[in-house]
């Protein structure tokens, strides 16, 4: 019984750590070399996006193309898989959306 309890605590602690440690804020467009930094962050973290979609609510971000994306993961998929040269302008919806 003691082993089961300690296993449950370990699983809970790991789950909590993952819920808060996975977030990967993309660099804002005001930073120099932001597209290169954005691509690096996306490549490092895109494999975590499937997990993020289950545990965290989407938080919209505004891209440099003035399109509102549902999350950093959504913007990363557009950059990596569709080859768009866009960066994150700011958190929240774009003003024209």
Curated annotation (Swiss-Prot):
It comes from the Eukaryota. Its main location: secreted. Residues 1-21 form the signal peptide. Glycans are attached at residue 85. One of its GO terms (cellular component) is extracellular region. GO terms for molecular function: serine-type endopeptidase inhibitor activity. Keywords: Disulfide bond, Glycoprotein, Protease inhibitor, Repeat, Secreted, Serine protease inhibitor, Signal. It holds the Pfam family Kazal_1. It is found in: Secreted. This is Serine protease inhibitor Kazal-type 8. It comes from Homo sapiens (Human). The gene is SPINK8.
């Amino acid at each position: 019984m003691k082993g089961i309890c300690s296993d449950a605590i370990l699983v809970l602690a790991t789950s909590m750590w993952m819920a808060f440690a996975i977030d990967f804020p993309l660099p804002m467009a005001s930073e120099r070399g932001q597209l290169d930094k954005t691509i690096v962050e996306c490549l490092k973290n895109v494999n975590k996006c499937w997990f993020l979609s289950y545990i965290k609510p989407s938080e919209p971000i505004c891209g440099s193309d003035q399109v509102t994306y549902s999350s950093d993961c959504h913007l990363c998929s557009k950059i990596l898989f569709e080859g768009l040269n866009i960066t994150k302008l700011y958190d929240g919806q774009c003003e024209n959306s």
